[in-house]
Amino acid sequence: MKFELDTTDGRARRGRLIFDRGTVETPAFMPVGTYGTVKGMTPEEVRATGADILLGNTFHLWLRPGEEIMRKHGDLHDFMNWQRPILTDSGGFQVFSLGDIRKITEEGVHFRSPINGEKIFLDPEKSMQIQHALGSDVVMIFDECTPYPATEDEARKSMQMSLRWAKRSRDEFDRLENPNSLFGIIQGSVYEDLRDESLKGLVEIGFDGYAVGGLAVGEPKEDMHRILEHVCPQILADKPRYLMGVGKPEDLVEGVRRGIDMFDCVMPTRNARNGHLFTSEGVIKIRNARHRDDTSPLDPKCDCYTCKNYSRAYLYHLDRCNEILGARLNTIHNLRYYQMLMEGLRGAIETGTLDAFVKDFYTSQGREVPELVD
């Protein structure tokens, strides 16, 4: 992987990630394909929304279908017929989400399979091996996602163990002679000094890119912004910056303003299946009865297949009837909305008009522009 940085506007960055399988324009949003599919979508449909790269879930793909079946197909690209770049998370967040059915030790994590209750062990070495089998273009280190809230002492112990796991991840990645890219994950909860220590340790190990982890886990939005404003300027300018698991459209805008290059989130797809649709004028809840006889498109400013061909009334009808097509059309729209937002942000950075773009974004939704700390 090669990262090119073209231009900046304030802290916002316009660039690209160049892989053997294709180029990813940044800032970029990665749709989430947890089980090797963006729910309800073919790879061609996902690509048509403007997506350059997908995120796959190491934990879930390891449990089902497993490494052996993946290898029989070649890798995850072949298995799901997506021949463009794929980033896989390490499984750390999913293990963290298991709660009481997992036990974290220095060696790794013991847990019971959420599928059949089988006892399973996952550690940094195994995570690297699974992601190698998946053929991930971007591999994420195995870390512990520090829960929120956490005391400073709890966050320090978690972060320091994640650093030790980062070194083990690096060593195993190198032992496997994996030709792809490995990203480190900055932890430290809401404590700036711990974030500093984490980043310093990761840079000493050496990675191809750096993710900001442990955010969007329940902390106030102000804390997320504060940590990003503190951490991003310290990350080497020639390395991509990835904000994991984020987020709402406004979170993407605020992340870009603070220097983030990559995002992923289940929100556009999950919300689509629940009739919660993002538009240029804010959120539309298509299940609301007001849309029952509305012949207008979902968003007249959107160029997606859904908006060009169907009315709000039709989408309302499909949702009321629990038709699969409704969820699919909603997903097409939400994913295209996210990609159009990223296209707009990239264009604004290129032309030095990001402030105006951000103002228009918030004004169209009747909201004030959040402050950006100098």
From Swiss-Prot:
GO terms for molecular function: metal ion binding; tRNA-guanosine(34) queuine transglycosylase activity. InterPro entries: ArchSynthase1/Queuine_TRR, TGT, TGT-like_sf, tRNA_ribo_trans-like. The keyword Metal-binding applies. Its cofactor is Zn(2+). One of its GO terms (cellular component) is cytosol. Zn(2+) binds at residues 302, 304, 307, 333. Signal peptide: none annotated. Its EC number is 2.4.2.29. Residues 245-251, 269-273 are annotated as: RNA binding. PANTHER family: QUEUINE TRNA-RIBOSYLTRANSFERASE. Catalyzes the base-exchange of a guanine (G) residue with the queuine precursor 7-aminomethyl-7-deazaguanine (PreQ1) at position 34 (anticodon wobble position) in tRNAs with GU(N) anticodons (tRNA-Asp, -Asn, -His and -Tyr). Catalysis occurs through a double-displacement mechanism. The nucleophile active site attacks the C1' of nucleotide 34 to detach the guanine base from the RNA, forming a covalent enzyme-RNA intermediate. The proton acceptor active site deprotonates the incoming PreQ1, allowing a nucleophilic attack on the C1' of the ribose to form the product. This is Queuine tRNA-ribosyltransferase. It comes from Shewanella oneidensis (strain ATCC 700550 / JCM 31522 / CIP 106686 / LMG 19005 / NCIMB 14063 / MR-1).
